[in-house]
UniProtKB/Swiss-Prot annotation:
It comes from Clostridium perfringens (strain 13 / Type A). It catalyses: (2R)-O-phospho-3-sulfolactate + H2O = (2R)-3-sulfolactate + phosphate. InterPro entries: ComB-like, ComB-like_sf. The gene is comB. Its EC number is 3.1.3.71. This is Probable 2-phosphosulfolactate phosphatase. Keywords: Hydrolase, Magnesium.
Length: 247
């Protein structure tokens, strides 16, 4: 098994992902939202790039009699006309269960759609990090951790999340790590904790200044969720792998 890391969505080369498994991370907050919404019973999550596409998809599904919720952000704030912002704490079971969630965010949904040439696209966060690691131990193809980043820039929060999952994989599986994957693993293993490490991150402080401390605490919590989610044919659903994941 070989493991690599891409540092932001701007560095994604869709063609180079052919034959590989992409693991997309937007820890603060898109993949944490996706993980939470599906864990709480959402039928599926549909990540789209533009706001216009989100409304078009919502109208299409509603015309078929489907229940739809719109979630996402621009500049970390709720989009006009959407049901939810990009706060995972809003996606409660009593609200999302059995419904389709259409999401559009600045970084995460863009990164997901840029990975469409990969053989498989897995959605990861700190919340389900160990479950993702256990799932990936059964794969032999090259794994590329795709950090969504912040507006095309490197984000230490996504890097830390990738390092955490890589570290978990390496506990049980021998892997060949690229230099950047080794660095992510080392940074994670050398830190005092995920939230402690990312407190100086630019995006962390943008969210903190907006009063979203509870989101930050939640998104930094390891292994609340023991499920794995795959982006396939434009939709994210729970993986039906037959692999038993024990947390």
């Amino acid at each position: 098994m070989k493991i690599d890391v891409i540092i932001s969505a701007d560095y994604i080369d869709s063609e180079s992902l052919k034959g590989k498994i992409a693991v997309v991370i937007d820890m603060l907050r898109a993949t944490s939202v996706i993980t939470t919404a599906l864990y709480n019973g959402a039928k599926k999550v549909i990540p789209v790039v533009s706001v216009e596409e989100a409304f078009e998809k919502a109208n299409e599904l509603k015309s078929l009699g489907e229940e739809v919720l719109l979630g996402g952000e621009r500049k970390a704030l709720k989009i006009d006309g959407f049901d939810f912002s990009n706060s995972p704490l809003e996606y409660k079971r009593e609200i999302v269960e059995g419904k389709n969630v259409i999401m559009s965010t600045t970084n995460g949904t863009r990164a997901l759609n840029l990975c469409n040439k990969a053989d498989k696209v897995i959605v990861a966060s700190v919340l389900n990090g160990q479950a993702v690691a256990k799932y990936l131990e059964n794969e032999e193809k090259e794994i590329v951790f795709v950090n969504s980043g912040t507006n095309g820039e490197f984000s230490s929060d996504d890097f830390m999340c990738a390092g955490y999952i890589i570290s978990e994989i390496c506990k049980n599986k021998e892997a060949e790590l690229t230099d950047i994957a080794k660095t992510a693993k080392y940074v994670c293993e050398s830190s005092e904790g995920i939230e402690e490490f990312i407190k100086d991150a630019k995006h962390y402080n943008i969210l903190k200044n907006l009063g979203l401390e509870e989101d930050l605490k939640y998104c930094s919590t390891k292994n609340l969720i023991d499920l794995v989610f795959e982006f396939k044919n434009g939709e994210i659903k729970t993986v039906e792998s037959g692999v038993k994941v024990t947390i």
